[in-house]
């Protein structure tokens, strides 16, 4: 297979839905977007199985997965909303948090599928796709919750899972900047987004 013909499976594992499509090496979309609801609570085994089935059904030769939690050196540090009983806004399951901690999902999925798989934080993955490659860049993702990535001259820098961090009014950033808050009161949501960006810029800019 020529490099230009290679099909890469791109997976965006979000708090409420899992989206995937085949793309070329150059980023051209090659297939319709597939979408399914995110299972909750979600164990590491469920995560691996869902991605494995998708790889098998597409015949992709490589896979990139955006993970909705904090990762360090390829291992899971924080689970985001995956270890919650029913998704965002529901209680965490401590035992499931521990089962996630330290998992090398790239290695596990590569072993399960027989193809090269890379799993990184979803905001970091977005940054790699849209970063300009120079200066200090702050990339913020907004959806069900929020994520943050920092790049300096095109290189990813360590960044926390800001979605779980508390806000001054007693919420966390996932709650304050997520889609539910936007749908409830967009004026307040816009103000909250502006204040969050100003705060993060003062820290990372």
Language-model segments: residues:
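Short glycine-aspartate micro-motif
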Residues: 8-12, 62-64, 137-141, 147
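Glycine-rich phosphate-binding loop plus the immediately following alpha-helix
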Residues: 18, 99-123, 155-195
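Proline-aspartate-enriched helix->loop->beta-strand connector
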Residues: 60, 196-205
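Glycine-rich phosphate-binding loop and adjoining helix at the ATP-binding site
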Residues: 44-52, 62, 71-130, 176
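Short beta-strand scaffold segments in enzyme catalytic cores
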Residues: 18-22, 69, 146-152
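Short, well-ordered amphipathic alpha-helical segments that serve as non-catalytic structural scaffolds
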Residues: 45-58, 191-197
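Short glycine-rich, Thr/Ser-proximal phosphate-binding strand/loop in the N-terminal lobe
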Residues: 2-49, 91, 155-183
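Hydrophobic, well-structured mid-protein blocks that either form specific transmembrane helices
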Residues: 117, 123-159
């Amino acid at each position: 297979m020529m490099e230009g013909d290679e099909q890469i499976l791109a997976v965006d594992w979000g708090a409420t839905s899992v989206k995937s499509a085949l793309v070329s090496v150059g980023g051209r979309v090659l297939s319709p977007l597939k979408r399914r609801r995110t299972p909750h609570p979600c164990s590491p085994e469920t995560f691996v199985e869902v991605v494995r089935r998708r790889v098998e059904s597409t015949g992709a030769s490589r896979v990139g997965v955006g993970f909705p939690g904090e990762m360090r050196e390829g291992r899971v540090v924080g689970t985001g909303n995956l270890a919650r009983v029913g998704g965002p806004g529901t209680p965490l399951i401590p035992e499931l948090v521990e089962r996630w901690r330290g998992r090398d999902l790239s290695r596990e999925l590569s072993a399960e599928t027989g193809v090269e798989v890379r799993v990184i934080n979803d905001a970091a993955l977005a940054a790699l796709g849209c970063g300009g490659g120079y200066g200090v860049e702050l990339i913020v993702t907004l959806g069900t919750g929020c994520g943050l990535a920092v790049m300096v001259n095109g290189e990813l820098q360590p960044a926390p899972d800001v979605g779980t961090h508390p806000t001054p009014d007693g919420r966390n950033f996932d709650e304050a900047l997520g889609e539910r808050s936007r749908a409830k009161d967009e004026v307040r949501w816009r103000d909250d987004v502006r204040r969050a960006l100003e705060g993060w810029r003062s820290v990372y800019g």
